[in-house]
Amino acid sequence: MKKNALLVFSIMLLALVGSACSVLGVGSKSFATEQSFQVGSIKAIEINNESWDIEFNSTDSNQITITTEGKQKDEKTDPVVIKEDGNKMIITQESKKAGLIDNFTFGKEGTINISIPKHGVEKIAVNNQFGNMEWNDIAIPAVDISTETGSTLIKGLTADIGKVTSDNGALSIRDSSIRELKVASITGDNDLTNVTSSSMKVTSANGSVSIKEAKESQSVVVHTKIGDIAVAYKDAPASLAVGASSHLADITVQLKGFKESVNAEQSKTGVIGKGLNKLELVSEAGTIDVR
């Protein structure tokens, strides 16, 4: 009996030690690469990311430079692979899972950093499973971001078309100019500050939408299910048609020159000037505040 108990104890101890080693990253080694590509040879960048963070930065160089730094769990498999497919650059990050413990992330696994000249490529598309993203002063015709879990911070983006789809994570866009912007969020708050866009549409299932230092534009549409909506204009609009409705919460519209046509418990509509531009705000169970 004592021998059996000792054997069981030894097996449990080995299992605990093995788990601890996995958690602490024992068995993995550091991974770091750097590659550069001449501007003009690459028209589009596609990133398929499993679990690393991603950073985009502007550069004055005439080259696109990609650096990676993180953990390599399998010596035979690089966690990040970069290849060219015609005029498209494809970056794939995948961490080989050695066991059950590797299905869980403990701390930061790694970072992919892309330095790109302004207007260096025509499109960047990111398919992100898990990881945070940061964009700094990128100028590009088209951006398409899809993320399952992770926060996204965008600063100083200049683009003709911007599309952001997020399942779970906060989104912040600051000091950017995006002619046509579409944001679709399931869970997570959306914060847009000093964003210029002639056509903006933001939808959120469970999360607030805040548009600060807003500028009057042709069309701004915001729909939420469970989440408050707040729009604060930098300068008073001159020609704006306003429609706001909420099924279960308060609606406040405080704009200079706003003439109400409907002032009901669940909706407010009205116009400023000729109403050439549109502001449409709809929430099923959130407050609406416009000022």
Regions found by a protein language model. Name each.
Residues T59-S61, E69-Q72, D85-N87, E94-K96, ...:
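Solvent-exposed coil/turn segments that connect beta secondary-structure elements
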